[in-house]
């Protein structure tokens, strides 16, 4: 057993204005919560070594592995539409990059690892609750087939952090295709630093779009990835809650799970985040906000797209406007799969929207409504206060399926593979967090294990499928930073 970690330092090799180099701040008594064994092995790491005292010390920030060049990254961003020219990693430190089994590089970052030059008077630490939440949510999203940052490990620090109350401290090890954000490009564009912008564009293309030859190609790649990502969110009833430009990745991965939530009773205007008082990031608004964010990326890239500003604006605008068709196509692919359809017809959008309208009118649980389609009409119709309304929709659905000549067994397989039985329901996440705060991590471990197999029948965990009872319901979520 050894803790040899072959870190590369690609981003740390960029000029100093891209980052601040500093070591994590040690903690007093690091303790292991969980190491993600499968992900560790995919990164060429020995899980047992990570769980050793030496490994836990590294995961807590008490020891910097040989080859790592720890840095905090600089970026800016629009937060709820308001411009902030100086954000950056205020409580996170990038250790370096590792080569994944798929051949691509992955960032390895410690969150809650102490103050940095970007902390803006913060302590640079993370509470246990947000660390457990990000572990649960990011790994659940991965199992659900959504591009996302990953959870490699979570450790306690033996220290306390002061927020609205005193909380146990923790450090989260996040793995990502990169931590490049729309806000990273905005940071340099706002400073008219064309050299840095070109360097960043070259880095991003090499990392995420190796076939892209220009900044416009990079922009188009980001637009396509984000269209696919948002469609996947919508297909799960997922609400990110804080779609600021510093929380939109160039890679197309979901990042930063602070106030996110999964809808239970379906309504397109649903908001959970306590800080989203005007519903800017409501479920229905997510595609529109994605376009707004991508327009900010396009604006940042204008000097690299064409020396003629009018021409640059013209082609960048055309690229951003292309999001609508890409998103609509991806959304239809997602919802066709959720309806068990393997072919495309013009009327499919009407069929999907028709069911969503019924779900909204009846306040039906989003996840159970779609999973119920696999369990037969008698099960599905009972979710509605007026089952006959569902029956009318189901006749059109069955007629559409008949066009494909699909047999019952194949249909069931299609539906169960596209519609999860288990999602990280807000009350279950909260229960796991509260138990962990009291020193009991068993509910956390159980929930993580259940969510590793979201599409499988798990009769022994059937209770995890159920929506919250009124007294359990989580109606508001918090950033928790």
Curated annotation (Swiss-Prot):
What reaction gets catalysed by this protein?
Answer: L-seryl-[protein] + ATP = 3-O-(5'-adenylyl)-L-seryl-[protein] + diphosphate; L-threonyl-[protein] + ATP = 3-O-(5'-adenylyl)-L-threonyl-[protein] + diphosphate; L-tyrosyl-[protein] + ATP = O-(5'-adenylyl)-L-tyrosyl-[protein] + diphosphate; L-histidyl-[protein] + UTP = N(tele)-(5'-uridylyl)-L-histidyl-[protein] + diphosphate
**Record-linked InterPro entries:** SelO
Key word Nucleotidyltransferase present in the record? Answer: yes
| Keywords assigned | ATP-binding, Magnesium, Manganese, Metal-binding, Nucleotide-binding, Nucleotidyltransferase, Transferase
Which sites bind ATP? 88, 90-91, 111, 123-124, 174, 181, 256
| This enzyme's EC code(s) | 2.7.7.-, 2.7.7.108
What does the record give as the active site? 246
Summarize where Mg(2+) binds, as residue positions: 247, 256
One GO MF term on file is: ATP binding
**First-tier enzyme category under EC:** transferase
Pfam families listed in its UniProt record: SelO
What are the names of the required cofactors?
Mg(2+); Mn(2+)
**What's its job?**
Nucleotidyltransferase involved in the post-translational modification of proteins. It can catalyze the addition of adenosine monophosphate (AMP) or uridine monophosphate (UMP) to a protein, resulting in modifications known as AMPylation and UMPylation.
NCBIfam families in the record: PRK00029.1
The UniProt entry's sequence similarity note says: Belongs to the SELO family.
Q: What is this protein called?
A: Protein nucleotidyltransferase YdiU
Protein source organism: Dinoroseobacter shibae (strain DSM 16493 / NCIMB 14021 / DFL 12)
């Amino acid at each position: 057993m050894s803790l040899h970690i072959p870190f590369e330092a690609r981003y740390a090799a960029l000029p100093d204005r891209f980052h601040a180099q500093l070591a994590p701040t040690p903690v007093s008594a690091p303790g292991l919560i969980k190491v993600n064994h499968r992900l560790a092995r995919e990164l060429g790491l020995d899980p047992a070594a990570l769980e050793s005292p030496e490994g836990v010390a590294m995961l807590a920030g008490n020891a910097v592995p040989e080859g790592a060049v720890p840095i905090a990254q600089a970026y800016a961003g629009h937060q709820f539409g308001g411009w902030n020219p100086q954000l950056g990693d205020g409580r996170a430190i990038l250790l370096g990059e590792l080569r994944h089994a798929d051949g691509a590089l992955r960032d390895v970052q410690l969150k809650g690892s102490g103050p940095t030059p970007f902390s803006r008077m913060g302590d640079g630490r993370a509470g246990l609750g947000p660390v457990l939440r990000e572990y649960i949510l990011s790994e659940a999203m991965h199992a659900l087939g959504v591009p996302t940052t990953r959870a490699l490990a979570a450790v306690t620090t033996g220290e306390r952090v002061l927020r609205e109350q005193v909380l146990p401290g923790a450090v989260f090890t996040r793995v990502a295709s990169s931590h490049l954000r729309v806000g990273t490009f905005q940071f340099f564009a706002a400073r008219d630093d064309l050299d840095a912008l070109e360097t960043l564009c070259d880095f991003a293309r090499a990392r995420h779009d190796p076939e892209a030859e220009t900044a416009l190609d990079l922009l188009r790649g980001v637009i396509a990835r984000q269209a696919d990502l948002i469609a996947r969110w919508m297909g799960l009833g997922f609400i990110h809650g804080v779609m600021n430009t510093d929380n939109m990745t160039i890679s197309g991965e979901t990042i930063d799970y602070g106030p996110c939530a999964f809808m239970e009773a379906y309504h397109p205007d649903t908001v959970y985040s306590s800080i989203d008082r005007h519903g800017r990031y409501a479920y229905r608004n997510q595609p529109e906000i994605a376009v707004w964010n991508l327009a900010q990326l396009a604006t940042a890239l204008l000097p690299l797209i064409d020396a003629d500003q009018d021409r640059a604006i013209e082609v960048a605008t055309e690229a951003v406007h292309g999001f609508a068709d890409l998103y609509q196509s991806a959304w239809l692919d997602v919802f066709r799969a959720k309806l068990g359809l393997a072919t495309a017809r013009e009327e499919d959008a009407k069929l999907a929207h028709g069911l969503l309208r019924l779900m909204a009118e009846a306040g039906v649980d989003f996840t159970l409504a779609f999973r119920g389609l696999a369990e037969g009409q008698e099960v599905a119709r009972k979710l509605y206060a007026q089952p006959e309304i569902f029956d009318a929709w189901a006749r059109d659905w069955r007629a559409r399926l008949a066009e494909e000549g699909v047999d019952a067994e194949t249909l069931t397989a299609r539906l169960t593979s596209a519609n999860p039985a288990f999602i990280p329901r807000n009350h279950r996440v909260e229960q796991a967090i509260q138990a962990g705060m009291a020193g009991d991590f068993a509910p956390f471990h159980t929930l993580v294990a259940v969510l590793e197999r979201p599409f499988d029948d798990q009769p022994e965990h059937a209770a995890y499928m159920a929506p919250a009872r009124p007294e359990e319901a989580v109606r508001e979520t918090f950033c928790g930073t």
